[in-house]
Structures are given as structure tokens and as C-alpha cells.
């Protein structure tokens, strides 16, 4: 039991241990299919090692667009090489829900782990149609998607790719 004083009140709580795995690996940029294969393999490996919450990095599916900061002409309007790379990134971005989220949900339920993973999200219809978002998904160990957060304000060169998110995903979820 742990006792803490918060706001003049004494609170007692039971401390639980949680084994967390943080995956430090490279996706297969910008190939979502192969990056998902890599993610699923690491999730299964971490679960077998006893992890109960497995975290993969920002935009792991299909990978972070580091070219933004290194590609000559990345900010030029209507620049053909950049348009080509952006089109490939857009094509490999994920629709939520979709087959990729289905695969993540299935593995979470099968190996009984929580999964936190960053994705490039593509909006196909409705509000935000045509936009890409830097999103974070949290799957509970029963496979349910319990939080879907879009990065509020992409920074610097990220603004050339991602739209501003909203506060809908700023909430806590029980593990």
C-alpha cells in the first residue's frame, strides 16, 4: 500500500507492477505492409518476454518522414520529386479503422497485451477528408481500440505533411 497526500487528503492505493516494452526499431519506410510485419513480430516477442504494454514510436507505420529535413526542395511548391515521395507516403498511410488496425487489435487480444503505436493516418471521407495526421493508437489487451489521438500541432517542417489534430484523443484510458 502506498499513502500519498494530495490536496490535503490522504489517499491509499495499491501499487501494481506493469512490464512495459519500448520497441526501438526501424520500420520499413514507407512500406506499411512490411512495417506492420515488423511491428507484429516485435509485439509477439515482447509479449513472450512478459511485457503487458508494448510501445512503438511516432509514425512507426509506415515510418517517420525524415526526408522533410534533408530533401533539397522539400518546401518548393509543385516540386515533382517531393510530390512523388509525398504520394507514396499518402498511399502507405492508414485509414482507421482498417486492415492494419484489425491486425493490431487481433494480436493484442491473442497475446493479451496493450499496444501503443504511432501511425500516419489518412482520412478518406468526412471531416478532414484528404488530410494526413500524425496519430497515436492505444489498443487494450482485449483488442479494443480505446484511444485514438491526433498530434495537436505538428512542428516546423512536419506541417507540410500533417494537418493539425484536435483534442478528442486527449484523455486517459485504463490499461
Residue ranges and their predicted role:
Residues 1-11:
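A short, compositionally biased domain-edge/stem linker segment
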Residues 9-20, 172-175:
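Beta-strand-turn-beta hairpins that frame and shape the catalytic cleft
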Residues 17-29, 135, 148-150:
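Active-site-proximal beta-strand elements of phosphoester/diester hydrolases
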Residues 24-41:
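N-terminal phosphate-binding loop and adjacent alpha-helix
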Residues 26, 60, 120-121:
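Catalytic metal-binding/acid-base residues of hydrolase active sites
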Residues 35, 43-72, 88, 108, ...:
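Active-site beta-strand/loop signature of hydrolases that rely on acidic residues for catalysis
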Residues 68-93:
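A charged helix-plus-loop insertion that forms the helical arch/lid used to bind
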Residues 95-96, 100-102, 106, 121-175:
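Active-site catalytic loop in hydrolytic enzyme cores
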